Amino acid sequence: MTEPILALSHICREFMTGDTKVAALADVTLDIDRGELVAIIGSSGSGKSTLLNILGCLDHATSGSYRVAGEDVAALDADALAALRREHFGFIFQRYHLLSELPALENVEIPAVYAGDTASERQARAERLLARLGMAERRGHRPNQLSGGQQQRVSIARALMNGAEVVLADEPTGALDRRSGEEVLKILVELHREGKTIIIVTHDPEVAKRANRVIELRDGLVVSDKRTDAAVATAAASLPADKPDTRSSRWSGLAFRFRETLRMALLSMAAHRLRSFLTMLGIIIGIAAVSSVVALGNASQNKVLSDISNLGTNTIEVFPGKDFGDARAGKIKTLVLDDARALDRQTFIAGVTPTVSTSTTVRYRDRESNVLVNGVDRSYFQVKGTKIAAGALFDAVAVRNIERQAVIDDNTRRTFFSDDQNAGIGRVIWVGKVPCRVVGVIAQQQGGFGSNQNLSVYLPYTTVQAQFTGDRSLRSVLLRVSDEVSTDLAQEAVTTLLTRRHSTKDFVILNTDDIRRTITSTTQTLAFLVAAIAVISLVVGGIGVMNIMLVSVSERIGEIGVRMAVGARREDILQQFLVEATLISSLGGIAGILIAVALGALLNLLLPGFQVSYSTFSIGAAFLTSTAIGIFFGYFPARRAASFDPVVALSRE
């Protein structure tokens, strides 16, 4: 005696309704042999659909034993049950359960996707099945473009896609007119003749007459099990080979399933464009904000540091006075040329320039304007990093001989001469009451501290002391520290030296590195604060992704049930919704990055001296962040989708 393909022994299935336990099946024992055409009949609530769900491994029994081809179903985990449904069963539903986003051909292919078949093999087999069922010309139509009978034919083709041994049909004619229902029954009878095991759940006695075995249920009990005179079909060998002879490798199967998952995610997004865009919007704003804040912070910092460099690179400057803002600083005359010479002899000093200054007027022909007169040494321009635009700088001889040679800045040139850079070279201007010959023009310095619209004239400091101030004391001593020496250590040494020379600390030191560090710290703090706000926006966007995905899961529970019924593993469902959430976040991240880059380019056009740039690292980090948000916030909805039992998901369609 051959082993039955399906064997149920003392099966019970109980449900809780409030505090009451209801038995849908009570002590059902059945054996179903290969090649049988079985009809399960009964009134509504008799337990026939529950029995069909247990037979198809969509539901589990409360007690009892169920074996499929000799294998105990109770010993199988969720993935093994999915494999059993995928390889042994085909389902035909009363409401068809076709996926609305897919055309008929791709609906038929779904079981083979989860089986890991190649795309070409899937398509060829699906086309053969549709052609066999008279649906070849409508393979590209979506479910809403098909009649009920046509949709049920597609459902039958899907049930046969993986070469199912057992076809389970739940009220297959219940939603069809008589003609369409008759066509579906003829197809099922034909499949039975070819060797398939067909189990039909119906309440229609006329449908049950087509079966060679009729099982009647009442209140969860088998009250009748009759066989007709019709012979059991055993001609399985004559059935065309719908099931593939070979499968792709495990890794290829994973790749195919992932590609299908990605395609389904894109289809779902396309079907709900506005919802997808609104979901992305939080991510777009967050990524654009974070990327822009980082880039703007770096640009601001670079701009400020560039402005600080205009004060001199690696420099410290000594001023008279007990402290900054000392009201008596102007009366302190102890900072003199000998101090500058003493500092110049120190090994850690790369350059020294004494400075004196005063304000006066400059006249050239009929033009007159107030200027700042700076008395400096030739090395001043090197220490400050100043570039010459035209002419030359005065030399050491001019300083020693107290010559009246002037170097003017670009503002002074434009005020008194034409826009030609060389226009003022060799001209004599009156600085106060002193005639001075212009020998050079320095290039305009962008930014800096204070207004860059001031007019400045640079003369040898000896000339300013002799011709203008009549004072031997200095306004300041500007020092350039050797590159290998810390400015902090140099500041301590200068303080020690001058305190010893003056017998008191009657000077203050401006360290440009201190300014640089302070401003850098400040800009970083501000950037951090703004970035924190942007990160909050990202988190809000991530929560939005999670909320929308939870809504999507609720709307697509029926789809989840269908996919599980045709063999999708829990990890396949998890992957599908996780990929969708990740895709939404990643596309939002890309859009946010593009907006940030466009904003940076616009700022660069509007503010030439302010250069916003985006590094490959920052762009990559922004993209990875958006992807991580999709994975993190999409995991919970995806896990919820994967946690449904197939029978529960199908019942909520």
From Swiss-Prot:
Membrane-spanning parts: 277-297, 526-546, 587-607, 617-637
PANTHER family associated with the record: MACROLIDE EXPORT ATP-BINDING_PERMEASE PROTEIN MACB, MEMBRANE COMPONENT OF TRANSPORTER-RELATED
Keyword Transmembrane: yes
The species this protein was found in: Bradyrhizobium diazoefficiens (strain JCM 10833 / BCRC 13528 / IAM 13628 / NBRC 14792 / USDA 110)
Enzyme Commission numbers on file: 7.6.2.-
GO biological process: response to antibiotic
Residue span, ABC transporter domain: 6-244
Protein's name in the database: Macrolide export ATP-binding/permease protein MacB
UniProt KW keywords: Antibiotic resistance, ATP-binding, Cell inner membrane, Cell membrane, Membrane, Nucleotide-binding, Translocase, Transmembrane, Transmembrane helix, Transport
Primary role: Non-canonical ABC transporter that contains transmembrane domains (TMD), which form a pore in the inner membrane, and an ATP-binding domain (NBD), which is responsible for energy generation. Confers resistance against macrolides.
